[in-house]
């Protein structure tokens, strides 16, 4: 189930109604999710489900599903299974014969893409690049991609990532999106080289979305 990526008003009526009716909510971070649930007076039982406890939690959630009860899966922000372990839970639900139903809503991937000004006809979502092993190879595989490439990145690695993309892919149109849908939303458009110059003197906080275009002279920002 999708939840807001920043602005708490970006949740659907259907999502609120479903969260109130299910037997259990599996949340990536219960502390952050409780803020959303409190806003909409949702008192459903909630447990944590994240990368480091997913295998233990799968067993507990499986028991709930086998009792013919519904479980809602939510992430910190946006759509589950996009760069988080909800994929494993979806697979397990399918294996035990439960119906899997997506309740759509906010997604940082699509919000950043449509507001970036880069081509939207084809895109590749890379998520977070590996911190070390396989990182360079993963970028090299994108050299000939005829699509907009979308990355998630932590602020403390953003400069390094932009620099490495510039070194391997060459200079291309690129965009940084941060704080999407929030009060201080910021979208910085330019090229990999111009973004690198900005990052030499500016530090962002939190997670950012980084978009890189194919190398096409018609796409560059003026």
Segments the model singles out, each with a brief description of its role:
Residues 49-55, 128-130:
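Conserved helicase motor
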Residues 5-6, 76-80, 155-157, 215-217:
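Short glycine-rich anion-binding loops that position phosphate/pyrophosphate groups of nucleotides
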Residues 1-51:
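Glycine-rich, flexible N-terminal cofactor/catalytic loop recognition
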Residues 50, 58-107:
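Glycine/small-residue-rich loop that forms an oxyanion/phosphate-binding "nest" at active or ligand-binding sites
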Residues 69-70, 148, 152-222:
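A contiguous loop/helix-start segment that scaffolds small-molecule binding in enzyme catalytic cores
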Residues 19-25, 98-100, 148-149:
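Short active-site oxyanion
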Residues 88-145:
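Class I SAM-dependent methyltransferase SAM-binding "motif I" and its flanking Rossmann-like core
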